[in-house]
């Protein structure tokens, strides 16, 4: 089989990962980390969303895209991660921000290449955490963590209809009902709402001594 005009010679999935980053101390107790990455998915094996026939029962000449259980795709993931950390005897402060893109390419039955966002393509993600240790023996620990992320992509539903199983020769449309059919929008063309979460935690340590 071929993908994007190139012969597919192996069933293995392939990817090349490029990454570069740096970490340095801004001032005492304050550390900055910056990291960029690019992942080139040369060959991916995915579930075939376009399958309409079983491979054994498909009419002669049916394209592979309409009869195979799996399909070949390519893709890329790239982005930037930035984190900042401050730490002393009482305080621990940490923040991280990620900017990311994850896209895949697939071919339709006419060998035209299409690009879509994956369902885990989150554009912005941020985490902030603060921890304070109190008490003469550091027995109290109070912490808070906040997470924010933009919504994940999803495939929207365009319409519902009654699907009649005409492949069954005994089906009578006058006396029997069909089942629910769904017409979907473009793949992952929708986006879920943004997500945020705040966790607050209080811990107390107890020390026991032997008499």
Where are these regions (language model features)?
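Conserved C-terminal beta-signal and adjacent last beta-strands/turns
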Residues: 115-211
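General secondary-structure edge motif
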Residues: 2, 61-64, 110-111, 175, ...
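Outer-membrane beta-barrel translocator domains and adjoining extracellular loop/strand segments
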Residues: 1-3, 36, 45-51, 57-59, ...
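A generic structural micro-environment signature
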Residues: 16, 28, 32, 44-51, ...
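Structural signature of outer-membrane beta-barrel channels/translocons
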Residues: 13, 23-25, 29, 85-89, ...
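Gram-negative outer-membrane beta-barrel transporters
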Residues: 38-40, 60-153
């Amino acid at each position: 089989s071929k993908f994007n005009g190139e012969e597919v010679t192996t069933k293995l999935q392939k990817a090349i990962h490029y990454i570069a980053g740096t970490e340095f101390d801004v001032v005492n107790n304050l550390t900055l980390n910056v990291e960029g990455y690019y992942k080139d998915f040369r060959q991916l094996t995915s579930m075939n969303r376009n399958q309409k026939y079983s491979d054994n029962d498909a009419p002669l000449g049916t394209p592979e895209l309409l009869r195979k259980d799996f399909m070949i795709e390519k893709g890329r993931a790239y982005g930037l991660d930035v984190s900042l950390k401050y730490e002393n005897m009482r305080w621990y402060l940490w923040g991280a921000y990620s900017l990311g893109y994850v896209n895949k390419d697939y071919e339709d039955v006419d060998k035209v290449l299409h690009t879509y966002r994956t369902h885990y393509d989150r554009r912005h993600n941020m985490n902030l955490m603060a921890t304070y240790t109190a008490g003469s023996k550091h027995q109290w620990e109070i912490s808070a963590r906040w997470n924010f992320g933009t919504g994940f992509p999803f495939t929207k539903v365009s319409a519902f209809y009654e699907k009649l199983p005409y492949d069954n020769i005994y089906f009578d449309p006058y006396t029997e009902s069909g089942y629910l059919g769904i017409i979907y929008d473009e793949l992952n063309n929708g986006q879920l709402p943004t997500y945020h979460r705040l966790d607050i935690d209080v811990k107390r340590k107890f020390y026991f001594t032997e008499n």
